[in-house]
Amino acid sequence: MTMVSSAIPMVDDDPARHRFRVHRDAMTSPEIFREEADRIFGHSWLYVGHESEVASPGDYVRRPVGGRPLFMVRGAKTGQVHVFHNTCTHRGAVVCRHKSGNAKVFQCFYHAWTFDSEGNLAGVPGREAYGENLDFSALSLRPVARMESYRGFVFASFDENVTDLATYLAGAREYLDLVIDSADSKMEVVKGTNEYCIQANWKLLAENSIDGYHAVSTHDTYFKYLIALGTNLKGGVQGTARDLGNGHAVLEYAAPWGRPIAKWEPLFGEDAREEIAELRAGLVARHGEERASRMADTNRNLLIYPNLVVNDIMAVTVRTFMPSAPDRMDVTAWEIAPRDELAQLRQRRLDSFLTFLGPAGFATPDDIEALESCQLGYRSGGVEWNDISRGMDRAPEANDEAQMRAFWRRWQQQMGDAACKEMR
């Protein structure tokens, strides 16, 4: 008897049956991992950093983006922010060897070719040994194919034909604006980073970051801690989820445990009540009651496809995650805050950041354990599909999964026939 096989997408989207599934090979397959490097990370806008990290001419930061070594620098002559491939145009060694700093030039340690902060080739030892017709200007540092900034957030793409950043961000712009406009001064990245790895597929963190369904069960210890401090959680956590287009999604919900910027709760201490009330009054004066209330009283977990999360909750955390294997990702997180905020408010913000979202806080260890447990479970091979069907027959609520379906639909669209499964 002849066996008939057919290839079906790894994302099974069946609205008529209220069913949405993702094949677990998407989280375990080495072939999928290799295809993602080009199809996803080679053709999307990827977060590089914030302009405040390179505030002065010559300031730079070095980091991997989309699995490639890059560095961002503010040019000393033009004052413009550049993003370069971190590789010497001579023989390939990296030219920016430190994580951050300030430099007039970047010198390759291999043969001492030197480049200025605008990327121009500024020095070649023994230059007279090269033929007079060699075009040294063509040997300047290579910028990424595309680099654009949205209100201080710098993105790069390796695809010169990618749509412009504002169009790509689509509905996510509204939520970045809420973060930025909540401050009465420019936002800046607070010095220091959190860096850690998770032994799980990167897409699990994309899901987890906008998953309201897991909060009560996974973070039970944190909710008990809040209740012990006097927080009233009897009404639950109400909110909604939105598909923002292009794979971006958001979870927006009430903040019964308060927000250090403008919503006082007992855990902040009685001495902070008046100060936080003044902050709220400032929001109302600048933005009106309705928008100010949204900034002060609601939290947002924003996913910008494919691998940027902005958590606007007890503090504002910017987090990226990049796969290094099918079952491993490297995570980096920064805290951003108004540049001129009061010292005591900055401290409260950082305390909130570390208490919940830091790698030793209440939330992150819980989430890491959950994601690594999922990855371990996939090894059994006994179950083929993950179910992401919750809420398909109603308007999305905070504990539904519409926001995750938005991510997966975009992923399947970009992966195309590379993310299909032979079925018999």
Where are the language model's segments positioned?
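Short, contiguous pre-domain boundary segments
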Residues: V4, P9-A26
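Glycine/alanine-rich phosphate-binding loops at beta-alpha junctions
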Residues: D25-V65
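Generic structural signal for secondary-structure transition and capping sites
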Residues: F41-W45, A93, H214
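Short Pro/Gly-enriched beta-strand edge/turn motifs at strand-loop
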Residues: G42-A55, G126-Y130, N299-Y305
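Rieske [2Fe-2S] iron-sulfur-binding domain
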Residues: V54-E160, D164-E174
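C-terminal catalytic domain of Rieske-type non-heme iron oxygenases
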Residues: V73-G75, Q80, A145-E148, F153-R424
